Regions:
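N-terminal signal-anchor transmembrane alpha helix
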Residues: 1-31
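Physicochemical signature of membrane-embedded alpha-helices that form the seven-helix bundle of GPCRs
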Residues: 9, 47-50, 80-83, 106, ...
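Membrane-embedded alpha-helical transmembrane segments of multi-pass integral membrane proteins
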Residues: 13-16, 20, 83, 87-94, ...
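Cytosolic, membrane-interface loops and tails of multi-pass inner-membrane proteins
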Residues: 22-47
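Core segments of transmembrane alpha-helices
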Residues: 52-64, 118-119
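Short alpha-helical packing/oligomerization segments
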Residues: 65-86
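Interfacial loop-to-transmembrane junctions
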Residues: 90, 94-119
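Juxtamembrane boundary at the C-terminal end of a transmembrane helix
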Residues: 122-136
Length: 136
């Protein structure tokens, strides 16, 4: 397979997205809400979990693929991909805890993990663009 890290990450996150989508549908059926959140806080929360995953995943997968195509170190990419996924899983866990009136700590850790992973990937790509493409 040409892009094994990107492919594995995409597959795992696709399954996670299906799970989150199921949670949204289940809540829609429960509250008989076809569109929006219908003034239901739990619906807001499950929709937020789903949409947040979709907001961060595409650009991360693109960056992983670009780095894999540039023959970047697969082990380092795998570590970053796992960190990103942990961040996304922690975000959902944190959203559920926050909705239950508990601390936002897990959401904060999730966002720092997600953003840090994305910044590292972006800087790595910029570094390769400058050093490999512009200076050679």
């Amino acid at each position: 397979m040409t892009l094994p890290v990107t492919a594995m990450t995409a597959a795992i996150l696709a399954l996670f997205f299906i799970y989150l989508s199921y949670q949204v549908v289940k809540q829609r059926v429960r509250t008989e809400t076809s569109f929006g959140a219908g003034n239901d806080e739990h619906m807001d929360m499950v929709r937020g979990c789903q949409s947040n995953l979709i907001e961060y995943t595409p650009v991360t997968l693109i960056m992983l693929a670009l780095l894999e195509l540039s023959s970047a170190n697969h082990m380092a990419l795998m570590v970053l991909a796992v960190a990103f996924m942990i961040g996304r899983f922690l975000h959902v866990f944190g959203m559920h805890r926050h909705h239950a009136g508990k601390t936002v700590k897990f959401r904060q850790i999730a966002m720092v993990t997600t953003w840090t992973t994305m910044v590292i990937l972006a800087l790595w790509i910029i570094y390769l663009c400058v050093t490999v493409n512009l200076l050679s």
